Amino acid sequence: MVKSAKIYKNFNIESRHKNSIILIGNFDGIHLGHQKLFLLAKNYKKKYSLKIGVLTFEPMPKMFFNNKLKNFRISSLEQKIDFLKSLKVDFVITKKFDKNFSKIKSQIFIKEILGKKLRPKFIFVSDNFKYGNKREGNVKQLIKSETSFGYKVIKPQPLLFNKKIASSSLIRNFLQKGELEKANRILDRKWSIHGKVQRGKQLGKKIGFPTANIDIKDYVLPSPGVYAVRVKKLGRNNYLKGIANLGFRPTFIEKKILLEVHLFNFSGNLYNKYLTVEFKKFIRKEKKFKNVNQLRKQIKIDLLKAKKTK
């Protein structure tokens, strides 16, 4: 039986998790570039018989400093932790990123947090890792402090995708442009949203296609349109195929962006249930129709395309 990762919300970790390998970063989406980092860390774990830990921040610093940056995340914290557990890390530190923490000087971060509290043997970071007040700290500074605090910095070469660095920023860009397949290739899986089903206006039900309205919270917003999806309920491993509309429902003049999911061969109450919606394929852009009958005809065409999607 595989032991589940220990989750910490501060730097007061148990002694068994000190002198470990620590990977530091946001790890939003945990894409192929991140996975390359974890694969290398596992080689070090095997070679030196060490545990692997992850230090990540919540909310992501970029979202903390820009409170207008509402739709940014590729994955929720829950999804991130679940994926880290699947990578079989030994522990995860989800440090709350707040005003006090943002003001910590870079040298204090190295001395007090890394040097005294975590005491890692190896620190894995990307080349552009910044830390400390006003992002004053960088990887060069970490390396200069190696001897003083007994750790070694590992900075792997980034993974390239079509001659560009495989990054969370690149994935967001692909999603926003409607290039779902490229985003999924860097993620090495289908991009997904995990959210709670909310009670809506039941417009889908009135026109013959009942939908579950998902709260998208602060997820990055992909290109508005219709998508082939598959859906999983919390705690279940089986998926249901479906179709989703992400957008403003221009036929009904909606002001708030919505994620509406219609499941094939399903009947039941999903209100207040948590669903994971995987985006498989982009079908078409959102469009305003002259009347409900035109919309209904188009939905039938969309359904056929979604059902054929593997």
Task: Walk through the language-model features, giving the residues of each.
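Short acidic-hydrophobic, aromatic-tinged amphipathic segments that line or gate anion-handling sites
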Residues: 2-12, 93
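Classical nucleotidyltransferase
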Residues: 103-210, 290-294
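Active-site-proximal cofactor/substrate-binding loop regions of enzyme domains
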Residues: 51-117
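N-terminal catalytic cores of NTP/NDP-binding nucleotidyl/phosphoryl-transfer enzymes
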Residues: 11-72, 76
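Residue-level signal for inorganic ion chemistry
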Residues: 31, 84, 123, 183, ...
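Phosphate/ribose-recognition catalytic cores of enzymes acting on nucleotide-derived substrates
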Residues: 199-310
